[in-house]
Regions:
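ER/secretory pathway lumenal C-terminal domains and tails of membrane proteins involved
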Residues: 1-204
Length: 204
């Protein structure tokens, strides 16, 4: 709230939308005042408490993504891209997929980052992030499918995020990658069930 504007009417905010804000002050805080050097270090053990705090309770990806939204909203696209890039730099040691940790809202934020990269004219960055997230989701889905009797909810949640990611990649103009994402997941189901989910190469 340190850069929010005081206005005489309701300021509509959400988890990834800070509403009205002084973007110059916001940029100053994010680039000059605040530091994430400790979070970005790779010489300490990231235990569950760190994961729970920085991916869930005080989501750092959520922070950077909401800042990027604020800049995008007022047309400051370069600043928006800078926030997303900084997020990836700072959070490089933290997992992209967190269904197994119980706070999958992080996965939603990563998909939103992919979508934003496309909107901001950075398709290569969007593609790289999408592939990395998908690989993690597919690996988790494969594990949960093996123990489907006990992990049906987790498997289905992974599937929901895979299809959500596929939609955002397709909306970003990456039809080929979207098709690969859908077909790979359907092939996993096909192998497990002996069905023909992926035999015709159709997308979901």
């Amino acid at each position: 709230g340190v850069s929010s504007k005081f206005v005489p009417f309701k300021n509509n905010i959400s988890s990834l939308d800070v509403g009205l804000a002084d973007t110059d002050r916001l940029y100053e805080l994010m680039t000059e005042k605040f530091s994430w050097d400790a979070l970005a270090r790779d010489d300490y053990f990231i235990d569950y408490q760190n994961l729970y705090t920085f991916l869930g309770v005080m989501s750092q990806r959520g922070l950077f993504t909401s800042m990027a939204h604020a800049f995008e909203k007022v047309g400051e696209m370069d600043r928006a891209v800078e926030m997303l890039d900084k997020c990836q730099e700072v959070m490089k040691n933290y997992p992209l997929e967190t269904v197994c940790l119980g706070f999958s809202s992080n996965d939603y934020i990563v998909v939103e980052m992919v979508s934003m990269y496309y909107r901001l004219g950075q398709p290569e960055k969007a593609r790289n992030l999408a592939v990395n997230l998908f690989n993690s989701l597919l690996e988790s889905a494969r594990f949960y499918l093996e123990f489907y009797e006990f992990a049906q909810d987790e498997f289905e949640l992974c599937g929901q995020y895979i299809y959500f990611l596929q939609d955002e990649v397709r909306n970003g103009g990456d039809a080929d990658l979207a098709k690969k994402i859908g077909n790979s997941f359907e092939a996993l189901i096909d192998i497990a069930t002996g069905g023909a989910a992926a035999s015709d190469g159709s997308e979901s």
